[in-house]
Amino acid sequence: MSLNTPTQAVTKETQIVPTETLQQALEREHRAIDGGIESYISGLAKGDNQPAPLITAVEGLRRHIYLEEAFLFPPLRETSMIAPIFVMLREHGELWKAMDAASVLLGKRADESADSETMLAACWDLLSKLDSHNSKEEPIIYPQADAALTASASAELAAFLEAGRMPDGWICAAAQ
């Protein structure tokens, strides 16, 4: 992951290009989330403590985990994807905890009680976990979004990708 790659802001809604597959839309969200974290890391390394890129990326990642657990994984569990889905759910819990840790440190950065090196380490940890997770999820799980989901499940996932919002207070089960 390069800090020099262009970043795309993560929004609460992802516009799906009409010819875009579900796999492509899900991967695009991954790139935007990674880009937000990378942008924050780059700024922090230069002495800029603007939290917006990290806050947006964490909000986007939480929403992304929700959409996978609510819309993508349930129908895939009914196929032969039980073991890979189990791994993804476990890793979602690890990612959620890493986001919580980074968010706590971000609050401490606001009052300057957390140093930049600690914050950078937390962000790199989150990015490393994301890289490991995405390297499995993208080639194994995401192709099934287009191949194995029913038309109604695909439509529901596409609609959420375009305009869905995570319920307030939702936490992935593996983080509880």
Residue ranges and their predicted role:
Residues M1-Q176:
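Small-residue-biased structural context
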